[in-house]
Curated annotation (Swiss-Prot):
It comes from the Bacteria. NCBIfam families: S21p (TIGR00030). Belongs to the bacterial ribosomal protein bS21 family. One of its GO terms (biological process) is translation. Transmembrane segments: none annotated. Gene3D superfamilies: Ribosomal protein S8. It holds the Pfam family Ribosomal_S21. This is Small ribosomal subunit protein bS21. Residues 60-71 have a biased composition (Basic and acidic residues). GO terms for cellular component: ribonucleoprotein complex; ribosome. PANTHER family: MITOCHONDRIAL 28S RIBOSOMAL PROTEIN S21, SMALL RIBOSOMAL SUBUNIT PROTEIN BS21. Keywords: Ribonucleoprotein, Ribosomal protein.
Length: 71
């Protein structure tokens, strides 16, 4: 949990903005969304494999586009 100490003469809005930024950097909201509902291990593996396949397809498409001639 990120801790923010309110500085002297600092407005609430600025302190809240700093807190939100530190929470975003720590990845708290993403973690909460991921843990909101139980996900079976097989579902987790399927999702991770799908993202891996998508990443590889994107990389291959980029390499093929780089190697094709434009004339």
């Amino acid at each position: 949990m990120p801790v923010i100490k309110v500085r002297e003469n600092e407005s609430f809005d600025v302190a809240l903005r700093r807190f939100k930024r530190s929470c975003e950097k720590a990845g708290i909201l993403a973690e909460v969304r991921a843990r909101e509902f139980y996900e079976k291990p097989t579902t987790i593996r399927k999702r991770e494999n799908a993202t891996l396949a998508k990443r590889h397809a994107k990389r291959n498409a980029r390499e093929n586009a780089r190697n094709t001639r434009l004339y």
